[in-house]
Amino acid sequence: IGAGPGGIFSAFELMKKSPETRVAVFEEGNTLEKRKCPIDGKKVKSCIKCPTCAIMNGFGGAGAFSDGKYNITNDFGGTLYEYIGRDQAINLMKYVDTINTSHGGEETHMYSTAGTKFKTLCMQNKLKLLDASVRHLGTDINYVVLENMYNEMKDHIDFYFNTPVSNIEVIDGGYRVFYKDEYMDCDKCIVSVGRSGSKWIENVCQKLEIPTKSNRVDIGVRVELPAVIFSHLTDELYESKIVYRTEKFEDLVRTFCMNPNGIVVNENTNGIVTVNGHSYEGAEKQTENTNFALLVAKHFSEPFKDSNGYGESIARLSNMLGGGVIVQRFGDLMRGRRSTEKRIEEGLVKPTLAATPGDLSLVLPKRILDGIIEMIYALDKIAPGTANDDTLLYGVEVKFYNMEVEIDNNLETRYKGLYIIGDGSGVTHSLSHASASGVYVARKIIEEM
């Protein structure tokens, strides 16, 4: 259930290693070529909240139109290694990389933090650079890879597009999957519904009495600035995952999803418009700006457990004030005033997303905003110009994490043959980890045949 990275790679592995196995994939969204967001920058300038978001749903999942970064590391992107072991997790991510590079990504570059001088530079300025090897496909090549994989799979696997699954029931010898006014029985069921399926998976777990526990939510902004400011980092590392501990509250703030010469985009999750970023491998689609997120993770304990609800309420406030995403100059934020169209037009950084000028201090909680401001000044020490007045901040960016589902080392629930994988499990938070979890479960199923 779900044709995102986890679902695709589990189905692909079953097709390759066990071709006699009948596999059906149910996907709420459309085929890859029919996934079209109506925003064109002309007639439709902002999100119109389609019932099924073409950016978030469909073949390829939310990652289909991402910048296609596959981080091969256990340091971030999920806790898959806690279930299957560090070595196996890395080996599976490397295997996923071979699939991507053999389906259109062979000319793309692998970046690495190994031996970089920037680790020392970060440490000298109270920052930490996390270790990773990064395969950057780019939004354009990522699409090609998915297209090639689908073309290889479509004649061997039964795909049901525009077909949301309403319920799963346990029956003798397997599971009954309900969709529209029909149902299908199966021996094994792999649930891979991603972050956009968070409410759905929560309901399924409640009905089947599968234990879950609260996860975190990441809240922050997307920063956009001239690409030359970060070029000394991005030319060598492409993406740098940098962590800072704030002096005021000792909260951790981190960079996320860095897009050199990229664009800022809207994202619709459960009817709420947030912000994200993309980048392209092809020079013809590149811009003069680089963007990245600055995020603060919030964990909650008793009595409050709804971390996603907390993030949604902040995003809704942004939508209420700005009709969608708000953009603000850093200089305006520090002067305690909202940005205006005139000041943004006069600025040195030309926005790549049509957003509403406003005041993010009316949206973000003070503790989170203080942490982001501290981080910007810390980054300014390793990338001078980050804290320039004309640096743009888009808000809000929220990364929702599913409730962490109770699964065993096979990624299997308390029900034999019912697996929950990818970001929908709350265990993975990245393309590489989600894809690796799909391969892992497919191999476990084949072992049991």
Regions found by a protein language model. Name each.
Residues 58-108:
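Dinucleotide-binding Rossmann-like beta1-alpha1 core, especially the glycine-rich loop
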Residues 1-77, 111-116, 120-449:
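Residues forming the flavin
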